[in-house]
């Protein structure tokens, strides 16, 4: 699970959350809480700079094209920033960790995840949102989701 990426490992958190939402089963959250927490710390300690996750392995490698010839375009104006993707996913994981901390009885962690999430969200908007155009980054579909 400890990779230098955020997007794919986020599935680990998402599956636990989906099991809780669909079945009310909190056991996966409780069982894996320490591992979730360790992953958040790993990313923070190794890849967080000025509240932006500065590394992404995969990025937006298969963006929706206007035509099929463009599906694997190498044009940088068509690719979503890996930093944008990783930071957005990291923020989502911090939001989930607030919930997981509460559900697993780790109430002492809730404030940390909330404060971290608030900082990440502010940094994300500061770096990627263009108020004059009303879109994020280079205005790809993925960047604006």
What are these regions (language model features)?
Residues 1-3, 10, 22-88, 101-145:
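Active-site acid/base region of carbohydrate-active enzymes
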Residues 15-18, 93-96, 100:
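Core register positions within helices of long alpha-helical scaffolds
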């Amino acid at each position: 699970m400890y990779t230098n990426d955020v997007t794919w490992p986020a599935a680990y958190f998402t599956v636990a959350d989906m099991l809780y939402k669909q079945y009310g089963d909190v056991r996966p959250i409780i069982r894996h809480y320490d591992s979730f927490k360790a992953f958040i710390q790993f990313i923070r300690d190794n890849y967080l700079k000025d509240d932006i996750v500065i590394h992404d392995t995969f990025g937006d490698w298969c963006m929706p094209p206007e035509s099929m010839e463009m599906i694997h375009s190498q044009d940088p104006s068509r690719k979503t920033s890996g930093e944008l993707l990783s930071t957005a996913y990291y923020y989502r994981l911090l939001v989930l960790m607030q919930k997981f901390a509460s559900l697993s009885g780790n109430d002492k962690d809730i404030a940390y995840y909330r404060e971290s999430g608030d900082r990440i969200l502010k940094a994300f908007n500061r770096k990627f949102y263009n108020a004059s155009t009303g879109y994020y980054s280079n205005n790809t579909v993925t960047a604006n989701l």
